[in-house]
Amino acid sequence: MAEISATSFPSSSSSALVIRSSHNGSLKCQNVAVPKTTSQFQELSLKRSQLVGNAVVTGHVTGSRSCKNQAIRAVLSGDGTALTTDSKEAGLRGKLKKVVLAYSGGLDTSVIVPWLKENYGCEVVCFTADVGQGIKELEGLEQKAKASGASQLVVKDLTEEFVKDFIFPCLRAGAIYERKYLLGTSMARPVIAKAMVDVAAEVGADAVAHGCTGKGNDQVRFELTFFSLNPELKVVAPWREWEIQGREDAIEYAKKHNVPVPVTKKSIYSRDRNLWHLSHEGDLLEDPANEPKKDMYMMSVDPEDAPDQPEYIEIGIESGLPVALNGKALSPATLLAELNTIGGKHGIGRIDMVENRLVGMKSRGVYETPGGTILFAAVQELESLTLDRESIQVKDTLALKYAEMVYAGRWFDPLRESMDAFMEKITETTTGSVTLKLYKGSVSVTGRQSPNSLYRQDISSFEGSEIYNQADAAGFIRLYGLPMKIRAMLKKIS
């Protein structure tokens, strides 16, 4: 049996946990009853009293609960490791020099700052990406970050890069996950993670950290990007390590560490917003039978309350990418922002779906993507003029795999990059304009034109044509239907 002792060291050192296997015997230790099962480690905590029948510890022991749990693991392994809780030293998980944390300013990421310092003995640099989530989300972040213990806050405007280099390639590819989801969160994570890698290099950090839970997709999206762009960086995911189980635990931890707790009312929904979309999850949405409340939506009006008069708009497209609105050339981010306003006014782009998460479970989400819904309708419609049947079929097939890879966080995978090269080539003639009618939640195409159109009115017309001889169809039909005819003949003989 292994043992733990709580002792004190001279000078300025604080109390420490000293762990030795029982055969060592050089220290006088208090006995610990080691449980036969290891399934309840997270429920253990070094206290004076008996802990749910798993261990009995006497003597004063200091340190965070996470440190104590780690101590118990070391006891069970009997590896003779000595671990201290001196705040000047590294935490029980080992020392890191400097960590770049993806920071939102909310309760969770604010609590992560002191947790990283306590458990890894590191300096924390907070990073916030502006991907079009709104100016209110960015207000007061530097003050919050430093009050939580961060050495600095780095903010970068990634909006144009996000739209140009991440959203528009997915739009050109026609990438839609499970027939509905336009990949709003999936596309945002790699651009944020990429910027974190850049910031880590700029500030000399040896690690990055995120606040994603162990149940979601985002942890994968962040970490696959880190692996792809700098495999030397260490990755810390507190939600997979700490004992904080929810909001109340986080608030208690924040108070103990003098972290200012946000006083804003906690939303009953879990939301993610960027320039492309706004997602809603949680609360009554967790039951797929429940209808979303009208006051949940933030980017779009209820279609029933939308204007009674339709609005017509024209989208200009070059080589498969939108470049203009109503004849006016706009930057990618500006164009999308304009369409969000117009589409939201008409109740465009609401999606309610149950999707298969990458980690195996199903989840229900409601998404608002007004501008994106309009752009998908425009680009796909113009392709109907400029692409032949085989090209459309192959492109649509690859679009499914493309969407799957983006959803799974494999943005920097060579396969996605190779498919992107195909999409760029196949859409190089997709240039022209599309006119759409927006009315009470619907997007209807009313016109399309392209200098590269494969549509020929003189051929397709029911009127007489010198190019297309209708008599030619007879031979084509005989050859095209020959296998079916032979099969029918065999059935008749048998």
Curated annotation (Swiss-Prot):
GO cellular component annotations of the record: chloroplast; chloroplast stroma; plastid
Stated name of the protein: Argininosuccinate synthase, chloroplastic
Enzyme class: ligase
Record-linked PANTHER family: ARGININOSUCCINATE SYNTHASE
Residues given in the record as L-citrulline binding sites: Y181, S186, N217, R221, S270, S279, E355, Y367
Single GO MF descriptor: ATP binding
Gene3D superfamilies listed in its UniProt record: Argininosuccinate synthetase, chain A, domain 2 (3.90.1260.10), HUPs (3.40.50.620)
Subunit-structure text: Homotetramer.
Keyword Metal-binding among UniProt keywords: no
